[in-house]
Amino acid sequence: MECPDPQPILELLEAPCPTIGQPRPEVGLRAGAGRVDIARVDGASAIVACVASSPLQLLAPSPRGRCAWIISASHGGGLLAGDEVSLEVDVGAGAVALLSTQAGTKIYRSRGEVASQGLSARVGAGALLAALPHPVSCFSGARFRQEQRFELARGASLLWLDALVAGRIARGERWAFDEYRSRIEVAIDGRTVLADALRLVPGEGPPIVARLPGVELLATVVALGPAVASAARELLERVAASPAERDAGVLAAASPLRDGLLLRVASRSVEAGLAFLRQRLAFVEAVTGADPFARTP
């Protein structure tokens, strides 16, 4: 039996592997880093670059359409002490992007090291970025820091949600972590228009449980720009028309921003708080064409 000429096989093996426009995750990235670029291509929003390095994972259930949808995840569903995760997002002019998470982010117990997470996003003129992750849950003894900065061109829009759960409530944990710090900055045309921070550290003032009696979830929403201005006005009016009651299950307060609002929510149960947010943010599907609270697009 004659053996076939091995040369064509060798040429095939030596040929570069075809790709789908996504470079190898480990090339040029430190551990936990990622980058996503979204652009307007032939009338649709499309992911034109997407790369990540473990423990960060990036999924693209809807890479092209009215809205490009990116889901971030991590191995094990959370961050260990010492993990540093950072993501850069660029949304080109006229594009629409939805950034969410696969599930809630768990922050595991630490013996001193801090788990950190960063997001840096640029949003072009006429573009919209909706950053709507599931809540963060800090376990007993956890240490977590988060920095997020959004740079918007004139005429760009942003919808941002940040939520924090008291901990593993079913196990009796309530605000038992060792450190939680979160900061957001938003700039429009190079000028900072919003800087907001939340710092919860035991030992700094009264116990956290005493400061947040009965509260299981805290959330902040920022809506800015022409794409969400109308919905923001309606939400502002709706919150203003609902006077806060001392024993209410969900408390909400809203402050007007130019072309938007800042909404704060405190809930006595995680379920009630999430239901409130889903209801108040139902307009997202109309402006993006995607449901951020659905399991799949």
From Swiss-Prot:
<comment type="function">
    <text>Required for maturation of urease via the functional incorporation of the urease nickel metallocenter.</text>
</comment>
<protein>
    <recommendedName>
        <fullName>Urease accessory protein UreD</fullName>
    </recommendedName>
</protein>
<keyword id="KW-0143">Chaperone</keyword>
<dbReference type="GO" id="GO:0016151">
    <property type="term" value="F:nickel cation binding"/>
</dbReference>
<comment type="similarity">
    <text>Belongs to the UreD family.</text>
</comment>
<keyword id="KW-0963">Cytoplasm</keyword>
<dbReference type="InterPro" id="IPR002669">
    <property type="entry name" value="UreD"/>
</dbReference>
<dbReference type="Pfam" id="PF01774">
    <property type="entry name" value="UreD"/>
</dbReference>
<comment type="subunit">
    <text>UreD, UreF and UreG form a complex that acts as a GTP-hydrolysis-dependent molecular chaperone, activating the urease apoprotein by helping to assemble the nickel containing metallocenter of UreC. The UreE protein probably delivers the nickel.</text>
</comment>
<keyword id="KW-0996">Nickel insertion</keyword>
<dbReference type="GO" id="GO:0005737">
    <property type="term" value="C:cytoplasm"/>
</dbReference>
